[in-house]
Amino acid sequence: MAERSQNLQDLFLNTVRKQKISLTIFLINGVKLTGVVTSFDNFCVLLRRDGHSQLVYKHAISTIMPGQPMQMFESEEAAS
């Protein structure tokens, strides 16, 4: 069965969600948010920290930095 193509944004967010990697999200207004992605869709990201959830609209996000190195592609395993 052919594998459905996934865009890079969805692949990245799904990887950090599954691996529960802590992120720092910088918004376009300069605000810095940290937490773990619990869910996302085409328009927003649900971020959880200290038992509280924040719904962040993607159009407000400037940069997302994972708190640790992450592997998104199987070929990265072989290269390491």
From Swiss-Prot:
The keyword RNA-binding applies. Gene3D superfamilies: 2.30.30.100. GO terms for molecular function: RNA binding. GO terms for cellular component: cytosol. Keywords: RNA-binding, Stress response. Coiled coil: none annotated. GO terms for biological process: regulation of DNA-templated transcription; regulation of RNA stability; regulation of translation, ncRNA-mediated. Pfam families: Hfq. InterPro entries: Hfq, LSM_dom_sf, Sm. Residues 10-70 form the Sm domain. Belongs to the Hfq family. HAMAP family: Hfq (MF_00436). RNA chaperone that binds small regulatory RNA (sRNAs) and mRNAs to facilitate mRNA translational regulation in response to envelope stress, environmental stress and changes in metabolite concentrations. Also binds with high specificity to tRNAs. Homohexamer. NCBIfam families: Hfq, PRK00395.1. This is RNA-binding protein Hfq.
